[in-house]
């Protein structure tokens, strides 16, 4: 019996010594000093870092926002080139390019709804987006691509609508009308567009004043009219753009029919410093 007590006391003493050694070494009792715990900690650390690494990869794969793929031959006649070719309000497009994957029409005025230009840029499988109020007019034009009628490719929209046009391209329609003049009445149902292409958001305002409901527009690149008379002025346009805060602002609708080249200067000077103005209208004077 005394032998059992002595052995128990000895065992307890050995266990206490082992615990003290373990505390001193910072290593749990019973773990061998063979580097295995350290390897496990390193592995756990690497696993914890993986989500951060994945986030960096996502950022690298995100579409780069720039304006190199944009041309504007005149007025508000915009062409965006990428995996898909997009035209907005094509006007005075004299070359029979027949390369448009998507054509967007903001309203019915001749410098935005130009039949010869539409027929020059359309191809057999083009999709045309227009205000719902213009659907009959667009259909009546009987726009053809190289070989056939493309009426089946017409999508009509009202402000507030969103349409997925194809993989990688979504279009949102936003209001476009005048507040203090009657050139573009709200009742006409004309619109501007936000075109989302592989994550990059292009805002084409159409002919509009600086409407309160446009202050919530989210975009990377904004095309806004600056010529005044029929639309907002350069100063008003800058005020709107400073609220929606795109990376780039491109003035349109000036320098030919209405407005002067100097309107772009006024617009650019009034922009916040973190917004870059880019001139694209080729014939502005």
Predicted segments — roles?
Residues 28-42, 46-98, 102, 153-218, ...:
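Core dinuclear metal-dependent hydrolase active-site scaffold
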Residues 94-95, 109-113, 135-138, 161-164, ...:
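Active-site environment of divalent metal-dependent phosphoester hydrolases
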Residues 142-165, 169, 238, 242-285:
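Binuclear metal-ion centers of metallo-dependent hydrolases, dominated by the metallo-beta-lactamase
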């Amino acid at each position: 019996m005394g032998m059992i007590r002595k052995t128990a006391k000895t065992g307890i003493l050995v266990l206490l010594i082992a615990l003290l050694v373990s505390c001193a070494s910072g290593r749990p009792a019973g773990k061998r000093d063979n580097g295995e715990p350290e390897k496990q900690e390193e592995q756990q650390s690497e696993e914890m870092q993986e989500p951060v690494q994945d986030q960096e990869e996502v950022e690298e794969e995100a579409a780069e926002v720039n304006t190199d793929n944009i041309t504007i031959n005149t007025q508000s006649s915009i062409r965006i080139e990428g995996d898909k070719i997009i035209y907005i309000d094509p006007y005075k497009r004299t070359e029979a390019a027949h390369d448009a994957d998507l054509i967007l029409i903001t309203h019915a005025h001749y410098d935005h709804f130009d039949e010869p230009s539409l027929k020059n840029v359309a191809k057999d499988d083009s999709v045309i987006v227009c205000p719902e109020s213009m659907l009959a007019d667009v259909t009546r034009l009987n726009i053809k691509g190289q070989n056939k009628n493309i009426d089946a490719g017409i999508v009509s929209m009202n402000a507030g609508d969103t349409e997925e046009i194809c993989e990688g391209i979504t279009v949102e329609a936003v209001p476009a009308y005048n507040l203090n003049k009657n050139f573009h009445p709200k009742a006409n149902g004309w619109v501007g567009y936000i075109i989302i292409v592989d994550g990059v958001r292009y805002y084409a305002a159409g002919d509009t004043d600086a409407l309160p409901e446009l202050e919530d527009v989210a975009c990377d690149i904004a095309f806004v009219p600056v010529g005044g008379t029929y639309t907002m002025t350069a100063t008003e346009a800058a005020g709107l753009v400073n609220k929606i805060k795109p990376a780039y602002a491109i003035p349109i609708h000036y320098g030919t029919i209405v407005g002067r080249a100097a309107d772009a200067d006024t617009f650019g000077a009034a922009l916040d410093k973190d917004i870059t103005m880019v001139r694209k209208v080729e014939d502005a004077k």
